[in-house]
Amino acid sequence: MPAPAALRVRGSSSPRVALALGSGGARGYAHIGVIQALRERGYDIVGIAGSSMGAVVGGVHAAGRLDEFAHWAKSLTQRTILRLLDPSISAAGILRAEKILDAVRDIVGPVAIEQLPIPYTAVATDLLAGKSVWFQRGPLDAAIRASIAIPGVIAPHEVDGRLLADGGILDPLPMAPIAGVNADLTIAVSLNGSEAGPARDAEPNVTAEWLNRMVRSTSALFDVSAARSLLDRPTARAVLSRFGAAAAESDSWSQAPEIEQRPAGPPADREEAADTPGLPKMGSFEVMNRTIDIAQSALARHTLAGYPADLLIEVPRSTCRSLEFHRAVEVIAVGRALATQALEAFEIDDDESAAATIEG
């Protein structure tokens, strides 16, 4: 029978860690802080599995380029993110994400997963077969591209005749791929933890600017009516909601005007919400985002029931919205603080458990 994690960690000068990094968009920057805290405390990461943003951070760390990636992420502003957006007229998604992948390729280089110094698994979802797909061989960038294809937002990625999308659809916290790793400690990092405080206020000016820039950037590719069709899609509105605003609408697009900012949802919905004291006002896209978070939290709990982690670190959903990729500095700090707190508590428990075992 394997020794408890407490004894395995206590008996090692550099405890071996298997790490499961969950999906959750920009909250995935917290994974960087978690890994930094582990390294500072002398833990040796010997296996990584990741879904979506967890696949990105896990992949760059397995390639030995986490510090470079963190530096790049911290340099991102709202304007640079706008330049990285890669609009698509495909019905499968409003973004292609190729510019973002180019930036990741520049950091990690042309490396194959089987050549990485740390065993690594990226998890994606086969949309046609309805199954999870594990990438443990092949180009790292292709595995990451498949794992980050948010449904309806980033177009799916075709690999060997399979249409692949975000790993978080079926496996938002991939514990199974690291179950066989020879480690002293298994750590799961979930990005769908309970709220730590009130949700942040919307940033309407940011979203209005995003829409105006999107219209101008896409006008060279297709006509204004096509741009209107693209940005009027529910998935496009969901992107705007996740970017940090309630919603943005325009009455007239014929001359690509500046965007008029309005509250989310039709008037009837707003009146109904206003008539119900004590309930938060949620537009249709906030409802959709919340639905996704609830589903992923339930899937993660189901996974942990079958593959328990020795230590679970939960990043609150309120840390940031899924597409607020300009907030790397503060989200990394949140991850580092949560990991430090969790590891300190675990190490204290380890000391007490070990003492009790010896005395018993």
UniProtKB/Swiss-Prot annotation:
Keyword Secreted belongs to the record: no
One family name in Pfam for this protein: Patatin
Similarity remark: Belongs to the NTE family.
InterPro entries named among the record's database cross-references: Acyl_Trfase/lysoPLipase, LysoPLipase_patatin_CS, NTE, PNPLA_dom
Annotated region (Disordered), positions in chain: 251-282
Organism expressing this protein natively: Mycobacterium bovis (strain ATCC BAA-935 / AF2122/97)
Family matches, as Gene3D superfamilies: Cytosolic phospholipase A2 catalytic domain
Domain PNPLA residues, every copy: 19-179
Active site (UniProt): S52, D166
Lineage, uppermost ranks: Bacteria, Bacillati, Actinomycetota, Actinomycetes, Mycobacteriales
GO biological process, one term: lipid catabolic process
Name of the molecule in the record: Uncharacterized NTE family protein Mb1092c
Assigned keywords, A-Z: Hydrolase, Lipid degradation, Lipid metabolism
